[in-house]
Amino acid sequence: MLPYQVITSNAELLAFCEHARHVPYLALDTEFVRNRTYYARLGLVQVRAADQLVLIDPVVGLDLEPFWELLKDPNVHIVIHAGGEDYEILAQHMGQIPTHIFDTQIGAAFAGHGEALGYAALVKHYTDIEVDKSQSRTDWMQRPLAPEQLDYAAADVFYLHDIYPRLRSELSAEKLELVEAESALQVAKRGEQTPTKWLYLFFGNAWQCNRQQLAVLRELMGWRLDRAKKSDIPLGFVAKDHTLLELARRMPETTGQLRGITDLSPMTIRYAGDDLLAAIRQGKAATELPAQLERLTDMRGYKPVFNAIKQQITALAKELGIEPGMVASRRQINDVIHWQWQVPNEAKSDLSPPDLYVGWRGAKLSTHLEAIFKRDR
């Protein structure tokens, strides 16, 4: 493996950024901690730019703005593996996510190496090297980081940099275009935020609520999100989903009644109980109630519509020479049915359409989907 440099000064970072602007592509990864916070804590940034591999230490108080500006440069191409949570970190610190990204997990899937291939499996396939994963659960905020932690972090971009051109060469021009489009789609999705007033539409057990309870649930979801962000604690630390559902259905009116709610912590009642009760009152006072929601799989016509969409997915996968799961998962099919049958028109103007309606999927499937929904319901 290449020798690596741990960057702990602004001068070192500026010098690296200048070098990185003149290479064909960067291999990028991040290490972070998110066990007890809403916002992830960035612990390390690993980058390989040609023959230079650096570990950027954000914990020591570096000015990272030159690096973020580097990543925003449309002439800088970025290679990343399974970048989902990395994109959230970048959005949090940069205010945006770079769009010129090639995700090697997506590339490997389109090259026929299986869906959701992990980094260790990717390295094993291309180099026959076993990557040490013993540090995957380490605390990246602690200092100093041990040599084995630094070696582990460096390996995440060392091999990725060399694998990228080999993987890219396996893809036809059409598949390369699809990989780039899918990478861009995944980046865009991580940057989206559902407006608070529509969060209840995507709450798994919302169908158990009547219309009045849905109005309360709508307010409760906004309360929980606001509390989590302001206190920088995970959503589940404020209130778990089953607790929100119980609150919405029982609609407690007093602090004493809050104490009878399953798993609602005394800390939440003490410091946020008044705001919680206010949210419930606001939901109860709503004059325009949400439409009743049914469990999707129980709705009339669900099964034939699901199967008809699945047939189109299978046909498209065969046409493209990829696995059906790369076109759409069961959840993505359900997202389309949910969108058509349960998302109000008013909400659709505020929300991004399901995956099957956008990008390369939409170009191939949208006409077929429209025909299915006109025919089967």
Residue ranges and their predicted role:
Residues 1-26, 30:
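N-terminal accessory regions of nucleic-acid-interacting proteins
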Residues 4-6, 46, 51-66, 70-161, ...:
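Active-site-proximal helix-loop-helix substrate-binding element of RNase H-like nuclease domains
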Residues 27, 36, 43-47:
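Non-catalytic, usually N-terminal nucleic-acid engagement modules in DNA/RNA processing proteins
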Residues 37-41, 55-58:
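Short, glycine/acidic-enriched capping/hinge loops at junctions between secondary-structure elements
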Residues 147, 167-377:
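Accessory DNA-binding and partner-docking regions appended to nucleic-acid-acting proteins
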